[in-house]
């Protein structure tokens, strides 16, 4: 890409090594980096533009960028005409959302908003406005993500070289475990239709279900907490504290002492990713691929891999028949053999690349394409 916009992302301070390497390459060839972050993060310090935005006001900035692209007539007209609908409604919607309007909300100067919008337009379609990771912390974050998607559409980025390529993943076959019984209830049963679009458990609702005063249909009496540090990840500390005091029992699975382990009745020490096998990695990418995470050294002291912890608990709860293997490597070897490889081969090569089956990475000039929407178009409004 020639222009990368990071809003809700702090590459360089997390474990996404592949992305960091690619961003480093982009910096070396003088790609423009625009970083929106209240603090001077690592990537902000490497950026051409750092926009120290007021927290929780991203949406105002995004809408003003959209306004500039449309009303300065610097969006990708040809792309929008072919692949999008709802442009006139969008144009009317953002009419008054000027950089001056956004400045009063976001504290970003109007001239900086205009300058950065023009940088994006100049790089179009080789521009990416990164959607961020784990960004749903505020009430309007779904709309925030929509605004980012709309911005990328106006820049002609979807399906274009230097923008967003069409990704593809390899399907990993499921190991033939015995069929699990259906749970008597799930977290959704407590919500009475709230949050219908949520596909995963809503942590704050699980905490509320642990507190008798909320009078939820299904009360939670115990927690097994794995891979999360509630005291630092739940914005409402008071809610967490009350929930932790309300449950009868807390078990924590973690690789090291954390804030949450101080609340545990029992701690089950998990070994680190360098000491265990994990499930086969198959993520959407340019080239479909699978990756094997395997142990480099034996686990230290009493720590164990998560599969071992789950299997031991299952056996003690009378559920041992659902863990019909002695070692998780048996599961991995079976799955890999269905995919034309084996655990032995993957231990040697680490990553295996497969041929694409879904077509080219990018749209050709003027190529017909149907997006995964009701209309088959990018729906701007």
Positions of PLM-derived features:
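Cofactor-pocket helix-loop regions in the catalytic cores of large enzyme subunits
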Residues: 1-169, 190-296, 300-369, 376
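Surface-exposed loop and adjacent secondary-structure segments within mature catalytic domains
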Residues: 173, 178-186
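Short, intrinsically disordered, charge-balanced linker/junction segments flanking boundaries
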Residues: 375-381
